[in-house]
Amino acid sequence: MGIGKRAWQVAGAAAGGASLFGGGVAIGRLLRLDSQRGDYRRSWENHNLATLERLRQLDEHPEGESPYLIVSLGDSSVQGMGASRVTKSYPARLASAITQQMDREVLLLNLSLSGATIESVELTQLPQMRGLGLLDGPYRPDLVTLTIGGNDVMAEDMAPGQFEERLRRILAALPSGALVSTIPSFGIMPQESRAQDMSDRIRAAVEDSDAHLVDLRSLTQEYSLPTYTFAYHAADFFHPNSAAYAKWAQLFADAWAESRREPAPVAEDAPQWDMLSARVAQSEYDD
C-alpha cells in the first residue's frame, strides 16, 4: 500500500503545511517510512514462523517449564511502523521487558496487520489465532495485547457503535487478562472527537470484560502539541516513532505487572529483543 492521502493530510495539518515537504529530504523520509510496511511485515512473518517451529519442537521435546507466550494483535502501530527498527516496536520492547522479570523463556507472536481495522481483527486475526491453535488448541497464550482503532477513526463508514460491538465480541473470544489500549490522541485533526468517542467505548468494553486497559490516549494527551507532533511521531505525522513506542511499551509493562500484583519491569532498561528472524537487519530506518 502506497503513502495514503491521510498521511499527507495529517502531516500538513500538524506541521502547518507545505513547508515541511518543500525539500527532497522530507519526501525521502516519507518514502522510506512507506517501505517499512513490507519490510516489517516480512520480518514479523519470518519471526512468527520460527516461533511456531520453536513451539512445535517444545511440544515434541519438552524442556522444563513451557514458554511464556505473548500474542500481539492490531494494526501498523503493533507492527512498529515509524520505529527505526522492528525490534523497537512496542511488542518487541514489551517482550524483552517481561523476559527480564521471568525465569521462563518468553516467546512472541505478532499477528498484527498494517492498515488493520476492528473488522480485520475479528475476521482475520482471531481466525488466524484459532487456526494456529492459539485459542482452542495446544498453544494458548499467556498474554494477548491489542491495539486497534486508529484506522477505524479515519474510516467514516465505521460507526462508533459498530466498532464497540465488534470489540466486545473480540474480547469475549480472547483469553482472560488481555491488555487492550485506547486510541492515541489525534491532536488538532478533525477526527479527534471520533478518537475520543471510540476510546471511551474501548474503556467501557474493557471494564465489562476480564481484560485490562492500557490508556495510550491519556499518555498522548499529556504532551504539548509541538512535543507530541515532533518528538513522538514518524515522518508521516501519523505513526509513532521509536521514542513513542518506548513510552507505549512501558504502559503495557505497567498494566501487565499490575494485573500480576508485582513491580513493573523498566522497558527502557531491557536489552533489544532477540527476534527469531533472519530479516531483522532489513528493517533499519531513520526515525
Model-based region annotation:
Residues 120-162:
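Oxyanion-hole/transition-state-stabilizing segment in secreted/luminal serine hydrolases
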Residues 188-287:
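Catalytic His-Asp segment of secreted/periplasmic serine-dependent ester chemistry enzymes
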Residues 80-81, 110-120, 149-161, 185-191:
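Surface-exposed cleft-lining segments at the edges of enzyme active sites
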Residues 1-71, 137-139, 257-287:
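N-terminal secretory targeting modules
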Residues 36-112:
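Serine-esterase "nucleophile elbow" of acetyl-processing enzymes
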Residues 107-109, 177, 210-212:
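Conserved beta-strand segments of alpha/beta enzyme cores
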Residues 147-151, 170-199, 218-220:
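Active-site segments of SGNH/GDSL-like serine hydrolases
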